[in-house]
């Protein structure tokens, strides 16, 4: 069958709906699109090279899981006909990678897809690419340094430097990055003098998108996290590690030695977005069991994103997991920065879209002698 249009007949596609739904046309027409995905490949290759040079072993863990663990998120559910049981598309590989530490592998990483049954936005796609890395006898501090090393190397590979421009604004990705405890950030950047002692009227004013019942259901850690998300996160343009997370929202992280109410945990924020999450890993099976039990209580109270009980993982910890540090780094959001992409759909070759009202079809039929390019009918905006 003859091609509908030749490569050189295109001079760009203005309709973003067609760009995302028919990426092959976008790649044919748009040099910038091809360059962006070449940059992505260069950056991902650099990521793997740096980790392997540091002695990390690349592994693969299950996509179909009996328990959707390792993160607070709503999973996709599928059914295994032969076994007559429901399974979950993984929301994170964390608990399997930690089992490998129990088994004796001291440095492991995986770059692969995670799946979360949540909304679509310029920053969210239901399936996305994530790096997770774990190192025995390391801690959260080591994972901060690893994060800086990886981002610095990937930026050099894709952009030939660490000082870039994102959406018309300067952005310096040169390590080391600033650090700021979460509570301090809420006080200093959020302008909330005493976030631990707020009345209902204050919370209603500061968290207007939550109902009275939702505000009442928040524990102290969730309340601080909600205040941070509403009043601090959008302001974090330059890279900053937010540290000292409340233990209530960190069920897989080790407690800080000098303050057991806090987790030895960090998240990296750039341009108002979370890019990385890491911590010193909890390896006490009794503490982990109690954390899972607390999360199960939260689920029974209506929190659909709370962690599930995973007794098999607790059993693995009872066999002995060494102290360790772990890191999760979102590849798509990082590639957005390196390619100056406004939407996550610009860095995923075939992003998920809302269904069109009718099947795509040629508007005028195949290209004729004039060389007119094939154009699909446009459905509703995603």
How would you label these PLM feature ranges?
Residues 1-382:
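Class II aminoacyl-tRNA synthetase catalytic cores and aaRS-like
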């Amino acid at each position: 069958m003859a091609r509908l249009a030749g490569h050189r007949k295109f001079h760009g596609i203005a309709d973003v709906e067609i760009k995302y739904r028919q990426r092959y046309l976008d790649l044919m027409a748009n040099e910038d699109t091809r360059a962006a995905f070449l940059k992505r490949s260069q950056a991902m290759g650099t990521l793997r090279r740096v980790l392997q040079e540091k002695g990390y072993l690349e592994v693969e863990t299950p996509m179909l899981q009996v328990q959707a663990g390792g993160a607070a998120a709503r999973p996709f559910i599928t059914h295994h006909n032969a076994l007559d049981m429901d399974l979950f598309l993984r929301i994170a590989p964390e608990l399997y990678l930690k089992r490998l530490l129990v088994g004796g592998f001291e440095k492991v990483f995986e770059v692969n897809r995670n799946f979360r049954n949540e909304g679509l936005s310029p920053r969210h796609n239901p399936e996305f690419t994530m790096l997770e890395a774990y190192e025995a006898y390391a801690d959260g501090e080591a994972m901060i340094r690893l994060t800086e090393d990886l981002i610095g190397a990937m930026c050099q590979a894709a952009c030939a430097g660490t000082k870039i421009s994102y959406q018309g604004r300067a952005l310096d990705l040169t390590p080391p990055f600033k650090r700021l405890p979460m509570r301090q950030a809420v006080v200093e950047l959020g302008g909330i003098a005493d976030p631990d002692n707020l009345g209902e009227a204050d919370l209603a004013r500061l968290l207007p998108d939550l109902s009275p019942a939702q505000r009442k259901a928040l524990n102290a850690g969730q309340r601080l996290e909600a205040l941070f998300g509403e009043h601090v996160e959008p302001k974090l343009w330059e890279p900053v590690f937010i540290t000292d997370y409340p233990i209530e929202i960190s069920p897989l992280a080790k407690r800080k030695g000098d303050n057991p109410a806090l987790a030895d945990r960090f998240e990296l924020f750039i341009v108002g977005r979370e890019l990385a999450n890491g911590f010193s890993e909890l390896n006490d099976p009794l503490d982990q069991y109690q954390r899972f039990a607390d999360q199960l209580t939260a689920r029974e109270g209506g929190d659909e994103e709370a962690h599930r009980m995973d007794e098999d993982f607790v059993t693995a910890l009872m066999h002995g997991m060494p102290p360790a540090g772990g890191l999760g780094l979102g590849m798509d959001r990082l590639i957005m920065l390196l390619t100056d992409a406004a939407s996550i759909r610009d860095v995923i070759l075939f992003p998920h879209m809302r269904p069109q009202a009718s099947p795509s079809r040629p508007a005028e039929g195949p290209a004729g002698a004039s060389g007119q390019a094939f154009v699909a009918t446009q459905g509703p905006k995603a």
